[in-house]
Amino acid sequence: MFQEPVYFQIFLFQLDSGASGEPGHSLGLTLGFSHCGNCQTAVVSAQPEGMASNGAYPALGPGVTANPGTSLSVFTALPFTTPAPGPAHGPLLVTAGAPPGGPLVLSNFPSTPLVTEQDGCGPSGAGASNVFVQMRTEVGPVKAAQAQTLVLTQTPLVWQAPGALCGGVVCPPPLLLAAAPVVPVMAAQVVGGTQACEGGWSQGLPLPPPPPPAAQLPPIVSQGNAGPWPQGAHGEGSLASSQAKAPPDDSCNPRSVYENFRLWQHYKPLARRHLPQSPDTEALSCFLIPVLRSLARRKPTMTLEEGLWRAMREWQHTSNFDRMIFYEMAEKFLEFEAEEEMQIQKSQWMKGPQCLPPPATPRLEPRGPPAPEVVKQPVYLPSKAGPKAPTACLPPPRPQRPVTKARRPPPRPHRRAETKARLPPPRPQRPAETKVPEEIPPEVVQEYVDIMEELLGPSLGATGEPEKQREEGEVKQPQEEDWTPPDPGLLSYTDKLCSQKDFVTKVEAVIHPQFLEELLSPDPQMDFLALSQELEQEEGLTLAQLVEKRLLPLKEKQHARAAPSRGTARLDSSSSKFAAGQGAERDVPDPQQGVGMETCPPQTTARDSQGRGRAHTGMARSKDSVVLLGCQDSPGLRAARPTSPPQDHRPTCPGVGTKDALDLPGGSPVRESHGLAQGSSEEEELPSLAFLLGSQHKLLPWWLPQSPVPASGLLSPEKWGPQGTHQSPSAERRGLNLAPSPANKAKKRPLFGSLSPAEKTPHPGPGLRVSGEQSLTWGLGGPSQSQKRKGDPLVSRKEKKQRCSQ
């Protein structure tokens, strides 16, 4: 019936320890085939080693059939015992013939009691073993024309008690067991291909050379579901077909980076379904890899939905610190994905110029490449298992990449990869943009200058003219040009305020009076220190107290100016010696008296009775100027000191010595009293002398009259002005019997330390009298009214006429 016999070589690599058969005996494995009609029958039995060596074949058991359409067949039971301790035996080789027409797979066969012990009870333990079946199809004489190898991985076995019949009450019919699928590899000898996974059980067996790396990858084909174990062992099965589960024999081998990367690409749609629009999608996909793998090993019958639900619950209870490792893993996977796309783009660009023009077009085209071209891509990925990837694994995830990339936000590594692909076109434009701001064009500068001129106005707009003027030394003109008129609205508001009497009064009350005096003087010298101290004292005063303090001195000054000032002149005993010539009484000169003089600068102003100041000059260079040098003090001529110091005093000419004082006509200012005697005809003839300004040059000496001045004729300053001037009418010398008022006495103050009677002084001419309006700060003693009036430019002409008439 068989046209071409098929031979199988079965190698037993591992035998479980635990239960053993009869002592000194080990079991061998026998495989036989028979053909009956359209069915194939195969029997696998275990026999003692002696029987196997003799080549005895077991009889075919009843009901041991195999359907031709079965694609995944496994051993239901493979009972055997471990050989006794002793020298290691080689693998058992059994050759059987099989018809070539049927499929080269094994089907289920009943669990007949193949090995029994003496007590008639088989062991209940289970073990795992690997069986390699090598098939050869021979025509005529036996020769290795076509060689095929099947790798069968046996799951835990079930031994049954003797006497149990298939389908009986004692032993129920066995069910299919979950095992690794059959991986056919054409034209390759893969005997011993699972040595690395199972720990390398070589044991010196005569095995063929190791297979290529592609055969060492775990199977990708999903396994079928199976029922529960009849003896209450652990359940088996798997999750949904889209979930990859590690087979039991590959648990010791860690997943490669490349496989985890592919699983991560498969799990991204699942993670996005549970976390839509979330940045944690990639990290959750990495988290699903170990969690779903553990759930599949613990409970293979668990569905995919249940596994995802458990994984999501575990993810929610995971802390952020524990999630960091998954974020890092997701970042690496994104880099792998971007690098893979870059390599695909490069491979497409190398084919021809049709994909080069736009950078965005090549990114969309490589998503559908043929399968043989993608095999080269794992070489560029930085993973250990990249070259081991089969060609059938890469195409499936490609249709999902555009979907996942379109939904998730582009992470940083991905953006870097995209920018690398887009960098070449814009590079020539960037340097041009950076070079533009290095040099400012003159048009922009001119426009900026025009705008600033419009904003600042025409005064600063013509910047060239003021700069030239400053270079030439003209500084005042730019200052005048820089002045801008104030706001007309502000001016109108100020005028409105000034028109109110109450406002002006309040402002005048607040302004410091000393500041007003300094401001109205021609040469103001403000004492900021004294002013600041006084203002600090006034800070603690209220408004009413401040107004009262400001108005009170003003009222006193007004009353003092209005009251007439009459009285005899008094001089301080500590003042310098003075001598006053009065008419022809002083004609005898005194040769013992020396004459010396120094000039004093004029720095004063005065006011007349109406408050108007008048400056008088021309007295400095007069030949008849009075120069006096006092030598001795006369006890008869002393002036009483004033009872109270003046309110305002400012000396303008320093003293020459302790007892000698030098005064020049015009050398010190003179202020006229507001209340002179109205009955004096001489005073009516004299104009209102405000003050006399002297020259800085030395004046010629002249002799004083010899006649002494009576004690009643001593002069005393009546009033001191704000600029240090005083007034002395000298009424008794003119024949006036007017006594000074008490108010005026209170304001008197001596000019010098002491006074001395005037010695005999020569008189240049008769008819000269001393005016009561003249100052005694420089010891004026002999000149007459005309002599004093000679310093006044208004009476200089009258003086000349009188001299000419004489």
UniProtKB/Swiss-Prot annotation:
Positions with biased composition (Pro residues): 206-216, 355-372
Chain residue ranges for the region called Disordered: 201-252, 345-494, 555-685, 703-806
Biased segments, Basic residues type: 404-415
InterPro entries membership: NUT (IPR024310), NUT_N (IPR024309)
Signal sequence extent: none
Compositional bias annotation for Basic and acidic residues: 465-479
PANTHER family reported for this sequence: NUT FAMILY MEMBER 1, NUT FAMILY MEMBER 2A-RELATED
Family: Belongs to the NUT family.
Protein name: NUT family member 2D
